[in-house]
Amino acid sequence: MHPEVSEPQADGATEPSLEESAGDHGRAGPGVRKEEINETKETCVGPSTTSCQSQKQQSGDSRLDCRSGYARNDRDDRGPRMTKEFLQKLCKQHKLYITPALNDTLYLHFKGFDRIENLEEYTGLRCLWLECNGIQRIENLQAQSELRCLFLQVNLLHKIENLEPLQKLDALNLSNNYIKTIENLSCLPVLNTLQMAHNRLETVADIQHLRECLRLCVLDLSHNMLSDPEILSVLESMPCLRVLNLMGNPVTKHIPNYRRTVTVRLKQLTYLDDRPVFPKDRACAEAWARGGYAAEKEERLQWESREHKKITDSLEALAMIKRRAEERKKARDKGETPLPDSEESSSTSPEAQDKPPLGETQQKIEVFVEESFKVKDELFPEKPGGEEELAVVEDRTMEEPDLPGSLAQSQTLLVATAEESTSSVAATDGTGTEDTEAIALETKERLFIDDLPDLEDVDGMDMSMEDQTKEMGIPKIQVISSLSDDSDPELNDSPLPMLEHTPTGSTGVLSNIFAVCKDSSKAVRVPLTDICEPRATTELETQGQVFSTTPPRPLIQELEEDGRGENESKPSLPAQSSEDGDSQLPEATLLGDRAENEAQSSLDLGKPSPRASLEDIEFGLD
C-alpha cells in the first residue's frame, strides 16, 4: 500500500528533473529530447496493472481496443438467450400454458435474442413472433410443423433458409433485413403472403424464384432497389397474385404509365401499391392499351354516364314513391279508395298477389289445428275406465252450480252437509225414504269409486252394504225431518201424513224420531231454532239453484203469503200451542225472529199453564 501511495509523488518529482535536464541541456538538439521521452515511456511499460492503466490513459488507441474487447466478452457471456427457464417465465408473464406443447402463440419480440433455440418442446405453435431482435440466421424450427405465421422483421438476416419443416406456413414477414435474394421458398406449398420490404433486392435474378411460388397472393417488395422493368415478366407468371406493392423502388419511374401498364399486364391484380384496382380503372387501362388516351377518355365517359344514370334512376324512383304516397293521402282525405299503381296492375294484379298469401295462411291454420288435435290426443289418450271418469265428472258438474250462488255460505259448510242437502231435497220432492236411500247410495258410489272393494269380495259384502245403508239412512232422515220442517213451508202442515204412507220397515224409525221430538219439544225447540236457521236458509237457496223448481222471488212471495195466512189464523192457535208445543217449532224455524215474535204474542194471548211458562223461561233464555 505504501509504495502505491508514494508512486504519484515519485512521478511528480521526476517531472521537474526532466524539465531541469531539458533546461540544462537546452543547447542540445530536439533529437535528444525525443530519445529521453521514449526512454521514459519504455520504463513505464511493465507487468504491473498500474503501469498498464497509466498507459491506457495516455494512448487513446489502446483505450478503444481494450473497451471493444470487454464489450465482446460481455455480449458473449451476458447476452439474452432462449433458455427453457426464460421461455417458461415468459409464458407465465403472458398468461400462457406452462406446458409448452399446449401453446399456439409465443411472443419473443423485442427481447434482443441473437439465435433461435430451445423451441423443440413447443410443437403446437401456430404463430411465432421474433421481430425486433438480433437474429442472424433462420434455424432450429424443425419441431414447428404446425406453424402458420412467422414474423422475423427487423432482424439481421442475410439469407432465407431452413424453412422446409414449415409445410403449413401461410404468412412470412422478412421485412427490414439484409436479404439480397429471394430463395428457398418453393418448399412452402401453401405460402400465401410474403413481405420483403426494406431489403437489398436489385435485379430480376434476385426475384426470379417467385415463379415457383404458385400459391402466393400477397407480395410486398416495397422500398428495395429494383430498377429493371423486366420484373413484370416474373410477376406475370404468378397466377394467384392479387396484391402487389412496388412503392419506393426505382422501377416505378422507369416504367412508362406505370399504373396502367401494371394493371393491363397483371390480369388478376385487385390492389396495387396504396389503392385498389377498381373495375372502372381496369376498363380504362385496357381501353388505353387498345387505342391510347382517346379510347381511355371515351371509356371513362361511358362509365361516368352509366353511373350518372344509376343515380338519376334511383332519385326518380324515390320521387315516384313520394308522389304516389301524396296521391294516396289526398284520395284518403277525400274519402275515395286509392287506386293501385299502374305498373303493379300491368305486371300482376293486386288480387292475384293477395290470393296466394291468403291460401297459404288458410293452409297454415288447418295444419295448426290438425297438429293441435294430434297433440291433444297424445297428451290425453282415452282410457278403458272412461265410464267411471264420466261419472265423477257428472258428479262434479252437479256440485258446481251450487258454488256461485252461495259462495259466502259454502265457506262455512262441509262436504257432508252438501251431500245431505242433495239427499234431503230429493226426499222432499215427494219420493219415499227408499228413494232417498237409493240416491244416497248412488252419490256414495260416484264420489268414492276408488274405495269400492274388489270383484271377488262383492258377494260377501252385500249384506253388510245393506246394513250400512240402513245405518247411514237414519241420520239422513233425521236431518231431512229437521231441515224439511224448517225449510219448506209447504210441508209444515203435513209432515205426518207422509210418514203414515211410508212402508212399515221405516215407520218404526220415523215414529221413534218423532216420539222423541214430542217428549222433549219444549226443551229442544230453542236449540233447534238456533242451529237450523242458517241451514234452513242454505236449503232454500240450494233448492232454488240446483233444481230450479221455483225462482227465488216467487218463493219469497209465497213465504210472505204463508206468513200472512198464519198471522191471520194466529188468534185460533193459542189453545193448540198450550196443548202441543210441536206446532210452534216450524213457525220459529221458518220465519226466524219474526216467527219468534209471533209465537211470543200467541203465547201471551193464549195464557198457557204455569208449568209450560216455567219451562219456556228455563230453556228460552239461553
From Swiss-Prot:
Coiled coil stretches, renumbered: none
Molecular function via GO: dynein complex binding
GO biological process, one term: axoneme assembly
Record keyword Nuclease present: no
UniProt-annotated location(s): Cell projection, Cilium
Top-level division of the source organism's lineage: Eukaryota
Residue stretches of biased makeup (Polar residues): 540-550
LRR repeat residue intervals: 101-123, 124-145, 146-167, 168-189, 190-211, 215-236
Domain LRRCT: from-to ranges: 249-288
Phosphoserine PTM positions: 349, 464, 487
Cellular component GO terms held in the UniProt record: axoneme
Annotated keywords: Cell projection, Cilium, Leucine-rich repeat, Phosphoprotein, Repeat
InterPro entries: Cilia_flagella_integrity, Leu-rich_rpt, LRR_dom_sf
Pfam families reported for this sequence: LRR_9
PROSITE patterns according to UniProt: LRR (PS51450)
Region of interest called Disordered, as start-end residue ranges on this chain: 1-80, 326-360, 481-503, 540-622
Ranges of compositional bias, category Low complexity: 48-59, 337-351
Keyword Repeat: yes
Biased composition (Basic and acidic residues): 22-42, 62-80, 326-336
Family, similarity comment: Belongs to the DNAAF1 family.
Function: Cilium-specific protein required for the stability of the ciliary architecture. Plays a role in cytoplasmic preassembly of dynein arms. Involved in regulation of microtubule-based cilia and actin-based brush border microvilli.
Name used for this protein in its record: Dynein axonemal assembly factor 1
Species, as recorded: Peromyscus leucopus
